[in-house]
């Protein structure tokens, strides 16, 4: 286990994974889960005061999925199982050390940097970005 969490936070993680990446499939949802957990364990940049899954998901202006109808409702058994896998420490490239992701417009490449962060890679329609290793040592 990478971080302490409650049953409510397991459900919350499953719901944000669904809301942000349902169209990206199971692997895409797992990668979004990686970003959420990374934000909760990183003690750097704009995540210095983020310590829990709840803090990470509800941090102001971060996850637009919280405004989606997909965020509401009970997560499915599959979605909970995916969230549990992330909580057990399963990481997937390019989200392994990522703190950010976004979906560029259709048929558009990922930017090499996004808010001064380096592109780690792309999965389907999500571009993932890593902080420098010397800045967020908890992630490396």
Each model region followed by its residue ranges:
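Bacterial extracytoplasmic/cell-wall-associated proteins, especially those involved in peptidoglycan
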Residues: 2-140
């Amino acid at each position: 286990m990478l971080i302490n969490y409650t049953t409510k936070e397991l459900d919350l993680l499953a719901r944000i994974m669904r809301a942000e990446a349902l169209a990206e499939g199971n692997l895409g949802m797992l990668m979004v889960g990686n970003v959420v957990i990374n934000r909760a364990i990183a003690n750097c940049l704009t995540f210095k005061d983020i310590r829990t899954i709840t803090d990470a998901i509800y941090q102001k202006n971060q996850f637009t999925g919280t405004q989606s109808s997909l965020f509401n409702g009970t997560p499915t058994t599959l979605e909970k199982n995916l969230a549990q896998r992330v909580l057990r420490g399963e990481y997937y490239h390019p989200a392994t050390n990522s703190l950010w992701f976004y979906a560029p417009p259709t048929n558009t490449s990922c930017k090499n940097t996004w808010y001064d962060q380096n592109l780690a890679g792309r999965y389907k329609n999500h571009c993932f970005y890593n902080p420098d290793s010397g800045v967020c040592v908890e992630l490396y």
